[in-house]
Amino acid sequence: MPRKGPAPKRPLINDPVYGSPLVTQLVNKILLDGKKSTAERIVYEALEVAREKTGTDPVVTLKRALDNVKPALEVRSRRVGGATYQVPVEVRPGRSTTLALRWLVTFSRQRREKTMVERLANELLDASNGLGAAVKRREDTHKMAEANKAFAHYRW
């Protein structure tokens, strides 16, 4: 195991179009096979579709969607004796943002619309309105944590 401690976080460069590190993170989550320009095109077009449908700044829509998807609690496996318990723990802010973006992208890819632009735009709009599969994942995560609250004293 490394002895130097955790690797330092690398600074996120602000997105050139919207000037937001969240958009940069979203582009990096969409990225497949190193095709960054394709990922950027998908994200920018999806944000434009969101702007047309809502009439508001797409970064505000993205932030609202993330706030509705970010989990506050999650469960972690902890082995005590011969049993494995699902122990509820609070989610660190950076991890909650990362999870929210990951869920948005994952559930966008599973949607039925024709293009990825439409899928991402509609998942963002659904999430900003408190609907959609990503918001359901957050609810399920919170339910799991609530159901296993009895094991909270095993926290580390």
UniProtKB/Swiss-Prot annotation:
One of its GO terms (biological process) is translation. It comes from the Bacteria. PROSITE patterns: RIBOSOMAL_S7. The keyword Glycoprotein does not apply. One of its GO terms (molecular function) is structural constituent of ribosome. InterPro entries: Ribosomal_uS7, Ribosomal_uS7_bac/org-type, Ribosomal_uS7_CS, Ribosomal_uS7_dom, Ribosomal_uS7_dom_sf. Gene3D superfamilies: Ribosomal protein S7 domain. GO terms for cellular component: small ribosomal subunit. Keywords: Ribonucleoprotein, Ribosomal protein, RNA-binding, rRNA-binding, tRNA-binding. CDD domains: uS7_Bacteria. Part of the 30S ribosomal subunit. Contacts proteins S9 and S11. One of the primary rRNA binding proteins, it binds directly to 16S rRNA where it nucleates assembly of the head domain of the 30S subunit. Is located at the subunit interface close to the decoding center, probably blocks exit of the E-site tRNA. NCBIfam families: rpsG_bact (TIGR01029). This is Small ribosomal subunit protein uS7. The lineage of its organism: Bacteria, Bacillati, Actinomycetota, Actinomycetes, Mycobacteriales.
